[in-house]
């Protein structure tokens, strides 16, 4: 095809491009390429079209093809460049710079403007890719092209500026040529700026300087540029700062550098480089403090400057700030490491490591040696530097490696003999090894070479300080060296510290010593020894302000857990000045520093003690004692604090520990005496007199031991007098005190003293104390002691001369006390008491003394009370009442004023008397209050007509008066043992509380007191009470003897001895005494009682008719007694005479009020119903009475007892009744808990059903409360057996298998001690328990043990048929396990069962034997026999059990598919009878299973669902019902009901049904 045709097609392509029809373009170009494969334009057009159609790869290929065809043609390269710019593709971007380079080459000669554009694009592209060097070179080509065009300098400036910007990143990493290019750009740009000075010019200059500062080889140019900029901008900080840093790094300290630093600080006083520079200058000028200060401030601004950090470390070393120097060295090392490229970095690191090593070596911590050695290892060429070797030797020496240090020292001295450091190291070695003479020589050699070295002088002085005895006495040499060291190095704190030692210990100049210590501490505030010495001397010199200032300055700067010495001393200072809270705070801070310092804990304890924090003080001293067990002081303080807190027994133990450790320690002996004295006073306040006497005896013993060691101590004699005097309250017969002979002036070890002798000893002790020092308190104590002595004498004799003399002495002593200290109200009060006492009778003086006491102290309850008592003694009731009233207002808890008001109320006959006396007993125990309250309680109790009044219920019942009065009287009689009326009242109250033995003892004391007084009339009355109480406790012979001691003429005497004869079994003598009493009886009531007693005697003699006649005689009296009618009812019941019992009950009901004798009436009525066979009526009667009297616990207990015996089906209600009885009255709990447990056992309340309410738990409580009741142990045995059976049925582990024999032994031991119970009861209980134990052993498989126990029981009780039955059961079980039971054996078993004709369970057992042999008819006969027997006995449970067993027997036969229609009928009949008695799920289940076996589908589902969905059904019965119901529903394919059943099973946790359903589903 011709060239024209190609051109035509290309023309069409161009038209298509103009029309933007790029597909057409491709079509036309392809047509061209078919004609001409290497057509340049066609490939370019294809590239363009593909680019527009977003086909970049095709476009690139087309352009590349065009470039290959004609590489120097622009069109294709332009297209390729446009494509790469347009499309953001990685390979395109990478190739774009090459395209730009080609375009630059093509445009260079053709189009300058296009060249500039492409050059800018290429530079920008390099900059975007962070290729700054190529970008700069490209940009430099553009600048050259512009320069060739001779453009103006202001037009060139932006170009050069951009050039500097491109190369300013990572200047130090640029090659030399590029660096030169950068510097040339700066130098070319700066002249191009027209306006100078200007901000633009300044910024460019700064940029230039910044770049130069990064080029170490351009330091000269940097210095020149900075100087030029300073010339142009003299007030600008930046060039000065850079120039200063240049001087600092180069170590330049010339005038020029210092001038720079000064100018910089003039412009900015806080400028970092300026401060650093001046700091370096100060360091060279040896102004180390200023250098350290300036360098520290400067480095806060310029952190990364290794040379400055080295200078700072050097300055800090010079002023001995080792910790700060270590930080500075580390900073220098880090900075030099970061600037590793710098030529001086190695030198700086070596210097920093050396300084660090020196700081570690010279520091106080011995743990720094290893770190110092590591630092020295980092120094380059260290082994060739002798000075560094010397430092290494010191480090080894500090580490304790003396051999290594010695080797280094020797090498240094051999190789560098002129070196002072080697000799110094040798001197240190000798000094540490205490070779002081050798050390002196070496140190002097070192000083010869370096005489201005303060450290050498210090160690030489230290060597002299510890050298020989001569130098120890004469410290002149040492102090000379310390003075030189201090002069050469005024920052060496240890030199000043030892100068302080010299002035303090040798020169005796404490003021100058304090100055030296203070200077040492100021130089090194970590030197606690210097600070502590400065503070201690300041306090010693009385300069507390200076001491406090030092301590405060330390504590304010101290971190937590540091500066213990300062906190401790400041804490002690505050403790001394009474600022206890601050003291506690500071001592806590001291303990944070050292928690194991026992002294600190003791100081803290003292601080707490000073501010009244006894508990915290106690803890502190206990901690101190724990840390230092040998400290006597800590234990003593613990004991004394416990004594203060009132825990005297614990304090006694602590004091005893002190005595065990240190022997006879007087403070501990005194403390023991005080504690025992306080224990005695506490016991006296509680009326525990014998305990008080023991405590007083111990107090006297310990105080006497203390006096033996220190007889000069007044406090010991005073305490001993107090101990002897406080025994005044104890009765004479109770006081028998052993006293050391030293107190009595003889050589005997101990001597027994009675009460008057002990009181007299107390008086002598007060006299001895007065001889040591005469004080008012001692005179008063002596007077009180004399008063108590006189009162004791008057208590046993009438007023004697001795008593009068003692009273007179008492008054004179107290008057002496008043004269010495007339403002003491207690002395006036004591004077008043003595003056108005019996034997003195000076009431006027007493009144005056009491009033004076009140004037001395207005809030004086004792004086007001005594004044009231004085007025009451004189019969002035109104004034007495007013005085007591004031006393009550002053202290409402003061019991004596309340007693006074009670006595006034009693005198005037007020109804508040009893309330007042009761209030006194509630406040505290006092003899007057106790006896007064007991008197009013007994008086109220004796009035039997007021028992139903509200006043009685409040005063006696609600206020628990009998118990309160009994307790008060018990304490009263413990102290006052000769008051027969008190003992009479106590006996009366004991009888009310049913404390029979205690009542007997009280009446015996009354008899003994009256016999001593020979009061016949009162003695006869007391003998009556005593005889009655003896009879009550079962001492009948003693009671007969007691009554025989009376004239036996009064009614009470005769009835008392008659009762004693009856209880003794002497019926004839009893009848005789009762008949004699009948002759003296005055009222019909008394006669009725005697006739009733005679009837009881006749009944015991077997004369029933005579007894009945006597009781009938009682009933015809005008006022028949209730007791006689009750006895007549009981006689009718005993003889099973319903008519007699009913008639007597009707007569009884006529004479008994509704609220009286509720329990007895209910008991008799219910017994009659039971006798008539009306058991439910008996239950209803008990329920009716409970409904009428719900608060009567006896009725609830009776109902609980009645239910299991006569209506066992209501056992759950019986259990509730027993629980209520127990809750209402604890006195009935002994029986009520047992009744409740028996009911629970009868109701089947097991542990598995309820963990709280079950028979086992209830019986365990009963056994815990009443272990003496054998019935409880027998019932507990039954409960355990029931639990074992339930565990066996539920396939659970059994934990109570081996307890039956233990319980049996308990029953036997408890019944042996029961005398008041009929023998028949104990025999029955034992037999029942034996049977239960034998059954338990049999069930557990312990057959041989069961057989042996049964055989033994038969031998002991051959008439007990149950044992024979049990033996046959055991033998039968053995036979069944071995062979078939023969016919003769069955006959023998039947005979045994017939011998137990009252036991339906025996027939049950025989039926089971027949069943095991397949003899179903015989088994049926046995069940019918048991059913008949249970029906005859009215045994509801037995009847129910027999019917269910009969039904189960019938079901077994039916399930065996035996063709006999009688058995299904028998099952239906038996279960129907059961359901007539009660709703029984088991009976319904048996009917349902029968229907299931006979395929009665509808009836089966109804019956089984009735059991499954019935609430309250047992788990076992419900499971069996679900099992059969699931099989039935599955057979009927009733999926809906099956799902309902499965949900029910899941709700009740019946997993077995779920498993059965799976098996049935899989099998179908």
UniProtKB/Swiss-Prot annotation:
SUPFAM superfamilies: TPR-like (SSF48452)
TPR repeat spans: 6-39, 40-73, 75-110, 116-149, 237-271, 306-339, 420-453, 456-492, 493-527, 564-597, 598-631, 633-665, 678-713, 743-776, 861-894, 980-1013, 1020-1050, 1051-1084, 1400-1433
PROSITE patterns: TPR, TPR_REGION
One Gene Ontology cellular component annotation held by this UniProt entry: cytoplasm
Keyword presence, Repeat: yes
UniProt key word Repeat: yes
Transmembrane stretches, start-end: none
Matching InterPro entries: Ski3/TTC37, TPR-like_helical_dom_sf, TPR_rpt
Record's keyword terms, sorted: Repeat, TPR repeat
UniProt GO BP: nuclear-transcribed mRNA catabolic process
Record's protein name: Tetratricopeptide repeat protein 37
Species of the source: Xenopus laevis (African clawed frog)
